[in-house]
Structure formats: structure tokens, C-alpha cells
Regions:
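Helix N-cap at the beta1-alpha1 junction of Rossmann-like dinucleotide-binding domains, i.e.
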Residues: 21-25
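NAD(P)-dependent short-chain dehydrogenase/reductase
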Residues: 106, 127-169
């Protein structure tokens, strides 16, 4: 998500709000952007929120008018299947939170909704791939009332959580 945020920031948007459950990720993205690009005229803010939370719902109700919503959230590692508690969280994040943000986007008149998926959704052999495949089915169903696009990505070299990223650290 940081690379996407930087690309959007460089285009001087009127409003760029970034939501991530990790406060540390938000601090890092702001530091990186400020040191690389400085400031924009638009409204750039970060929010350390869980999309599944009541606080996120209040945030959307307070300022939920967005032309574009990019949902880049995911529990994307097969190791997240190791216990039933993390597995339940994976289903919440990958399926139910996606459905929630699509519904909120449709209700608020969002022009375009984008959601990232994985190559593992093509022919799922594990719960992570299956959860993303189910998410894609929700995307297809919701596309009747919301302009939606999605892309399947394989593991991206040096992305957060990848093996190559750990070497870079």
C-alpha cells in the first residue's frame, strides 16, 4: 500500500486519506512521503483504524465521500491458517471487511472501487486462497451497483512480508 500511496501523493490529489490498522505503518508512510515529496495542497491524512471497527464506521460517516476507494488490505500469508483465531480474522479481513467497504462505497456514491486479490484465488488449495476467491465472488455480485475492478497479484518482490523484504531489513 505504501507504493500506491506514494504514487497517488505525487499526483497532488485534493484528498488522500490512508487507513491502516498499524500505527507504525502510518508513521513510516508519512515520514517516507514527507522526506521524498514534501507536502501537497490537498488534504493528506492517515488514520490508524481497523476497517472492521466502530471507529472506522464513525470515520466513514463523518467524511465518507471519496471518488476512489482502494482496498489493499489482506491477510495474505498461508501461515495465518495456523490457528482457528487467526483464520477467523483472515475471513473477517478478506471477505467481510471487503463487503463492508463495498457497501459503504456504494452508499456514499464512490465512482470507483478497487480491491487487490491474489493468484492463489485462481484455483485455491488453502484457506487464504479460498477466502480471496470468495471475496472475488462478493466483488462480482456487488459490481451491479458499484464500479469495481480488481487485480490478482503473485507475491511481489520486496513487498511487506515477502521473503526478499526480510533480507532488505
Amino acid at each position: 500500500g505504501q507504493a500506491v500511496t506514494k504514487e497517488i501523493f505525487k499526483r497532488n490529489p485534493k484528498k488522500l486519506h490512508v487507513v491502516d490498522i498499524s500505527e507504525n505503518n502510518m508513521v513510516e508512510v508519512v515520514r517516507d512521503i514527507r522526506s521524498s515529496f514534501g507536502y501537497i495542497d490537498g488534504d493528506f491524512q492517515t488514520f490508524a483504524l481497523d476497517i472492521g471497527s466502530l471507529e472506522y464506521d464513525a470515520f466513514i460517516k463523518a467524511d465518507g465521500q471519496y471518488d476512489y476507494v482502494l482496498n489493499l488490505s489482506a491477510l495474505k500469508h498461508v501461515r495465518s491458517e495456523k490457528d482457528p483465531f487467526t483464520l477467523m480474522r483472515m475471513i473477517d479481513v478478506n471477505i467481510f471487511n471487503t463487503e463492508k467497504t463495498m457497501r459503504q462505497s456504494a452508499e456514499s456514491g464512490t465512482k470507483k472501487y478497487f480491491c487487490v486479490s491474489t493468484d492463489k484465488a485462481a484455483n485455491p488449495v488453502n484457506m487464504m486462497g479460498a477466502s480471496k476467491r470468495i471475496m472475488e465472488m462478493f466483488l462480482i455480485r456487488r459490481s451491479i451497483d458499484l464500479n469495481i475492478s480488481t487485480a490478482r497479484f503473485a507475491n511481489v518482490a520486496f513487498s511487506d512480508g515477502s521473503l526478499l523484504h526480510s533480507f532488505d531489513q
